[in-house]
Amino acid sequence: MKFVSFNINGLRARPHQLEAIVEKHQPDVIGLQETKVHDEMFPLEEVAKLGYNVFYHGQKGHYGVALLTKATPISVRRGFPDDGEEAQRRIIMAEIPSPLGNITVINGYFPQGESRDHPLKFPAKAQFYQNLQNYLETELKCDNPVLIMGDMNISPTDLDIGIGEENRKRWLRTGKCSFLPEEREWMSRLLKWGLVDTFRQANPQTMDKFSWFDYRSKGFVDNRGLRIDLLLASAPLAERCAETGIDYDIRSMEKPSDHAPVWATFRV
């Protein structure tokens, strides 16, 4: 089974990239983040014609996530159990049947956080990671097939930082988000629960592959970016991971998202 995660940075602005992903990868499951479209305005017909069951959880102008599945899910959940009406639309989950049993897929657009001293955004990022941790610990078991994918807005290791050493030090010094010690600790807790970073498992030393590139500084041209889009798998999936990758070809299309799609294939 093949899973693709893509921060599309506006679904209605980039249908050409979604179509290209489907044509090239033929994924079983696609997780989209930052769809930026209210549920009532979601282009359901246009997306469904690509051959998928389509589930979405969005709001006007910001955030928003969607799951596209070949197989009909057993169940779909939008948001965390305790989310109120005011909660940002950032997470969607599904139980997807497979020969391995039902796979719990969690697709998230994790808060960016901005910087350590931001009074709202940084605590919101911490809370989101805590909510996910709580969900894993209370609702799921790590010996079952679980896949968390999405724009997680954290570079797990220094190998995932490609913005230059001076910028790396400056970001740490000024408290800018993406690889602060606190953020690394949140990520570490997820991994300790029983998840594996599929890309890093397959590429333990790779230090020149990234998934986000800044528009303004034309980071993609120079391969200056961060690997912040991840597929984290529990052991039953991780040990069956056949291939992973980051699709630079899709990122190099006309009018692209600032993110590249990331993907993993599992032998199930």
Curated annotation (Swiss-Prot):
It comes from Salmonella typhimurium (strain LT2 / SGSC1412 / ATCC 700720). Its cofactor is Mg(2+); Mn(2+). Mg(2+) 1 binds at E34, D258. Major apurinic-apyrimidinic endonuclease of E.coli. It removes the damaged DNA at cytosines and guanines by cleaving on the 3'-side of the AP site by a beta-elimination reaction. It exhibits 3'-5'-exonuclease, 3'-phosphomonoesterase, 3'-repair diesterase and ribonuclease H activities. GO terms for biological process: DNA repair. Its EC number is 3.1.11.2. This is Exodeoxyribonuclease III. The record marks D229 as: Important for catalytic activity. Monomer. The keyword GTP-binding does not apply. Mg(2+) 2 binds at D151, N153. It catalyses: Exonucleolytic cleavage in the 3'- to 5'-direction to yield nucleoside 5'-phosphates. PANTHER family: EXODEOXYRIBONUCLEASE III. It comes from the Bacteria. The record marks N153 as: Transition state stabilizer. Probably binds two magnesium or manganese ions per subunit. One of its GO terms (molecular function) is metal ion binding.
